[in-house]
């Protein structure tokens, strides 16, 4: 499933219009995202948003933060490399992740 279809399906399950959901998602400056921007996200015409907006979408749509980051193809800031990880540790983490997905 694409990022857009995941948020669209979750929004519909919550019986929210695009306008209602957009009004609940605030940019870093405190203003709401536009319904058109949300529409573009749902139709995969825009790249998934930043962590600030992803966290809010997860909360409003009752999706786990981890799942939403996964379908967005990104990592939360707390998982981004600090530059001290060895290539072996990173590879081991990805192998563990793949094993968990196959269960």
Regions found by a protein language model. Give the residues of each.
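A short, Lys/Arg-rich alpha-helix, primarily the initiator
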Residues: 1-16, 23
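Interfacial/linker helices and their anchor residues that mediate assembly or domain coupling
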Residues: 73-103
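Helix-turn-helix DNA-binding elements, focusing on the entry/boundary residues of the two helices
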Residues: 7, 18, 35, 54
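Recognition helix of helix-turn-helix/homeodomain-like DNA-binding domains
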Residues: 26-48, 70
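Short alpha-helical "recognition helix" segments of helix-turn-helix
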Residues: 21-25, 57
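DNA major-groove recognition helix of helix-turn-helix/homeodomain DNA-binding modules
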Residues: 49-67
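Alpha-helix N-cap/N′ positions at the starts of helices
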Residues: 2, 33, 89-92
């Amino acid at each position: 499933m694409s990022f857009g279809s995941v948020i669209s399906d979750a929004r519909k399950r919550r019986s929210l219009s695009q306008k209602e959901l957009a009004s609940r998602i605030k940019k870093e400056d405190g203003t709401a995202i536009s319904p058109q921007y949300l529409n573009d996200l749902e139709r995969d015409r825009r790249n998934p948003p930043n962590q600030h907006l992803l966290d809010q979408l997860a909360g409003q749509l009752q999706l786990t933060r981890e799942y939403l980051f996964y379908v967005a193809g990104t990592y939360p800031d707390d998982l981004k490399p600090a530059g001290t990880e060895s290539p072996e540790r990173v590879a081991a983490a990805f192998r563990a992740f793949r094993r968990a997905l196959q269960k």
